[in-house]
């Protein structure tokens, strides 16, 4: 089965660089403590690496 990533926004992006705010939005996160599911791809992993201090990530079997 394909692995998916559950990404949860846990810390506000206020005071951080604009590219980090845009990355949070690109991941599909609109509100704090919201979670989204994404396929485990190198592009998504790169975005997570950019904002790893603002989000938590869990691997989910889908």
From Swiss-Prot:
GO terms for cellular component: cytosolic large ribosomal subunit. GO terms for biological process: translation. Pfam families: Ribosomal_L30. CDD domains: Ribosomal_L30 (cd01658). The keyword Ribosomal protein applies. Keywords: Ribonucleoprotein, Ribosomal protein. One of its GO terms (molecular function) is structural constituent of ribosome. It comes from the Bacteria. Part of the 50S ribosomal subunit. Belongs to the universal ribosomal protein uL30 family. This is Large ribosomal subunit protein uL30. It comes from Heliobacterium modesticaldum (strain ATCC 51547 / Ice1).
